[in-house]
Amino acid sequence: MQQTKKLTHSDITIAVMSGPFLQRGEPALVSKWYRTKMALACGVDLVVELPYAFSTQKAETFANGAISILNALHVSEICFGSEDGQIENFYNTISVQKNEEETFNRLVKQFMNAGNSYAKATSEAFLHILSSEKNIDMSQPNNILGFQYIKAILMQNSSMQAQTIKRFASHYHDETFNDQHIASATSIRKQLFSENSSFKEIEPFIPKATASLLASYKQNYGTLHNWEQYFSFFKYKLMTMSPEDLRHIYEIEEGLEHRILSKIQTSSSFHSFMEALKTKRYTWTRLQRACTHILTNTTKEEIHCANIEQHAPYIRLLGMSQKGQTYLSKNKKKIELPILTHTKTFDHPTLHIEQKANSVYFSIIQEPLRTQLLKQDATHHPIRYDETTAKFL
């Protein structure tokens, strides 16, 4: 965050944040409201939600939704972390792909026909068409997402500029702490759910406010969220579904439904199910997203109605500092998308999916807290933060 502010000289900082489920197809550790508090306490001025229909998607759709929201908010510059760290290389890679589009598409098809996943086929195709050191490594997850951010900016004819910060020490999927001060999200999550989990182990790697809010959430609601806690619900749902039922679920391709129903029979945990399910063609992340759609009962028809090929249909405001509130007041008339401070009176297919996802997310919380959280989510107004006193209002 501090590096971003230093690099961009920004007046205000806006974060577009996933809701209950994340792009890699798993539940967020804590609710979006607690994560909003974390972001505000760490210097973000406006926190807005990326709807489920965009947030639990491949990088291209995820980026398209996020950029459309930032565009609507009249953001002048974005900043993202990447393994490469040189913004010129991203633009150069996009240019090469555009010039070699026919060859690139042919190679992707060729590698997929050989049994590779789309992600692997795309990565291999890039290796074949990219030869200069001025191109990015498209096998790295943050490079891929950054590439799609810039591609979305260009596709949406935005005047937004892009900056990137190089990720050091820890890689995105590292499962252990390899540095004294920097850790991957994967390693932090693994530590939190280990047998001898302790918040003290992760404190050196996260802001003090984040550690405090994580501990507070677990104390208040009795848990942090991961896939294993939803496995009994997930297995029950699959055991009552037919192949035809599964085929209606978003991201379930023909043939995958039979493999899923077969492997669930002998799986006693989500991890063992995923180990049995994954293949060369279907990556872990791709399958986790499909499993998320099964859990939330998100159908192909619902995603079609959400019209994800276009921009996000609204802006759900989750939190703001006083500086962020001033920015919104000054620019409200210029912002063309509706800004939602709650969702109880707004109706849209994208929001219907969001409401289901929230209901599923809180299903592991014990009553009566579960019902309270579900009622609050639709009526919850944006969290306000006074950055001068470092207090929530």
UniProtKB/Swiss-Prot annotation:
GO terms for biological process: tRNA modification. Gene3D superfamilies: HUPs (3.40.50.620). Keywords: ATP-binding, Cytoplasm, Ligase, Nucleotide-binding, RNA-binding, tRNA processing, tRNA-binding. InterPro entries: Rossmann-like_a/b/a_fold, tRNA(Met)_cyd_acetate_ligase. Its EC number is 6.3.4.-. It comes from the Bacteria. It catalyses: cytidine(34) in elongator tRNA(Met) + acetate + ATP = N(4)-acetylcytidine(34) in elongator tRNA(Met) + AMP + diphosphate. It is found in: Cytoplasm. GO terms for cellular component: cytoplasm. GO terms for molecular function: ATP binding; ligase activity, forming carbon-nitrogen bonds; tRNA binding. It holds the Pfam family HIGH_NTase1. ATP binds at G81, N142, R167. Catalyzes the formation of N(4)-acetylcytidine (ac(4)C) at the wobble position of elongator tRNA(Met), using acetate and ATP as substrates. First activates an acetate ion to form acetyladenylate (Ac-AMP) and then transfers the acetyl group to tRNA to form ac(4)C34. Belongs to the TmcAL family. This is tRNA(Met) cytidine acetate ligase. The lineage of its organism: Bacteria, Bacillati, Bacillota, Bacilli, Bacillales.
